[in-house]
Every structure is written in structure tokens, then in C-alpha cells.
């Protein structure tokens, strides 16, 4: 703070030009001065601009139909899951806008649980939602979490990932999305409460409760364990949307048992047994998750349940070709950089889809199958300048035959050398 000294003469504010006699205080900097009135005015301008930015951020939340249309560009199938997610996300950010206004009715948060087999698109759906809304997004693995005080990650480290995704802008992170994968792996081992401590199962569920509901959490800036005399980042989780996903292997048997108890008469059991997995998953209820091993308090904080179906051959073929960043488009672009045209025949795409179904890896396994097929092609083609086109046939995928190569002079080469798929 600058103090008045008569010997130095009158000092003026560098911004408004008022003398020190005309204002209450002057703050001195290196060769400049600012009065209390200008400080107050600048503060108002900055606060007004920041307030406007905050309002604009979620002013134009896409409508559920618009959200689903964008999801359709990246994710094939899963129509019911897309609809559930579109409505839940729209309501969540509409709620944030509503709660920022003074009102008697405060809307509570609806987190989401996604149930579906490996490779059905759970993570991709969550990532695409964050991209649509332009909000910070973080993925956490529930299997690495443990209850506080035990070896493993504290649940607060999930929040640190979101803060890092927001470039340490806490206010922005407080309106982000967190996807917790493998949530089914923290289910307790039996339906009944255990007398022994389950630090990586029920203990993690207990630790996540407050964060899911909404609390001001203390996060260590460098991650790791908390310890005394350490600085923390304070983050309010009230407006963070949590999406918890898992395969929940075996839950269809729990659903079958529940449905079987409600059907009476001869042949009732056979009717339930005939139901396919995707039909069963669409009938999942909170009581099924309870029997699977999630605690009631945890289930209560995930009111929206979106079930995803296992992908069939037709859906996998569409995944290979239709989305904006489809694998076939990616590999075609890659070979274009070597001035070679790449073509996948229809039966080749079908064979790739069949292999993925056999391996039970869903869409996630498609890339590894194509990598195996394309390995020799991508190894040899850069060294040759006589090839115009490479055709992947059904035999290339199913029997390991070499791809058909069309040379620039029109010659077609199809060697019998085996390639691994």
C-alpha cells in the first residue's frame, strides 16, 4: 500500500487520473498507481465477464434428439442406451442451469449406470457425450481403487484426473463427466454383508457414496495418498455427472431367477431359459444389482440404468464401415498415404465380425483382428511402388490367404502364402 509523503508531491491514479486527495487509497506498483475506485470497477468488469462465460457454457445444451443423432455418428446400435443417456445428460445440464437460479425447488442429480458386455460401446458412448457437450472428461478404473488407508488408489484420485483434464480449472471440472469402468468388479462377494473387511469391494462402494451424491472433496494436487501438512484442491462434486459401467457377467442368471419366480405354469421355466442375453439385460432392475453385490446406498445414487446389448454380426460389420472414424476408413486412409487403394470385400467383413464374436471381445477385438490380417501388407507395401490396389477377401480372413494385389499395369497377384489373422 502506498502512503502519502508531502515531499514527493501529488500522486495520481494511472488509470483515472484522480489525485491522492480525491480518492481514499492509492496502491503503488513499479512506476504506476491505481486508486480504490478503479480497483472496484475492474473487479466488477472481471466478475461480470466470468459470470457471462459461465452462463453461456450450458446455455445451449443439445436436445435429447440432437444428442442421439450425434451418438449415431460414432456408435452403432444400442438405441435404448442412447435414448436413456441422451435424456439423462440433457436433464443433468438443464438441472445445473436451473439450480444456478434462485428457486424453492432444487433438482437432484441422476448419475447413470451402464450394463453391457465387453466391447459393446460403454466407454465410447461416455467419451462421445463429453465431446458433444465440450466438458472435461475422465476415465477411472474401479479395480485400482481401495478403501482409504489400504494399498491402492484413493477415490479422490478419480477427481484429480478430471481436474487434470480441465487443465486444473476447478470450476470447469465441477461440471465435467467421470466414467468409472469395471464397476461390477467392486461388488461384494456375496449378497450378505461380510464380517471381514472387503477393502477393494464394498469398501470402495462406501468410499464413492459421498462423491457420487455431491460433496466438497479434498484432492491431493500430485495424486497418491493424503498426508498431514499437505495442500489440497477443493472440488465440489454436486454437478459432476458420474457414469458407472461394467459387464456384470452372470447378472442374466439373477434376472432369469427373478423372472422365473413370477411366471407360473407348465413350460414357464423353459420360456425364461429361451430368452436371449440382450432381452434379459433390458429387464434389469435395482434388485438384480443388489443381488449381484452392489450395496443399496450405491444403487440409490445411480438411478438411471442403461443396458447395452451384445453386438451381433450385422452390428459389427456396420461398426467396421459406418461410423466417422470406422476402422476400414482408418486403414484405407493409412494405405492412401502410400498411394495404394484398399478394399475389404463384404465376405471379408463378415469373417472379421465372426472372429470377434468367437473371441467374445465385441467391437474392441476388431482392431486386433485387422492388424493381424494387415501386418504383412503394411510391412511390404511401403517398399514397393508397383501396387495400385490391395483387396482383402473372405479367404484372407478365414483361411489366412494373402490379399489380392492389383499392380499398376493391371496384373492381379494372389499368392498362396499364408498370413496370420
From Swiss-Prot:
Residues the entry annotates as binding Zn(2+): 13, 16, 35, 38
Cross-referenced PROSITE patterns: CLPX_ZB
Keywords: ATP-binding, Chaperone, Metal-binding, Nucleotide-binding, Zinc
CDD domains (alphabetical): RecA-like_ClpX
Keyword Metal-binding: yes
Single GO molecular function: ATP-dependent protein folding chaperone
GO-annotated biological processes: cell division; proteolysis involved in protein catabolic process
Listed GO CC annotations: HslUV protease complex
Pfam family, one: ClpB_D2-small
ClpX-type ZB domain location: 1-54
Record-listed ATP binding positions: 117-124
HAMAP family: ClpX
Description of how the protein assembles with itself and partners: Component of the ClpX-ClpP complex. Forms a hexameric ring that, in the presence of ATP, binds to fourteen ClpP subunits assembled into a disk-like structure with a central cavity, resembling the structure of eukaryotic proteasomes.
Function (record text): ATP-dependent specificity component of the Clp protease. It directs the protease to specific substrates. Can perform chaperone functions in the absence of ClpP.
NCBIfam families assigned to the protein according to its UniProt record, in alphabetical order: clpX, PRK05342.1
The family this protein is said to belong to: Belongs to the ClpX chaperone family.
Protein's name in the database: ATP-dependent Clp protease ATP-binding subunit ClpX
Gene: clpX
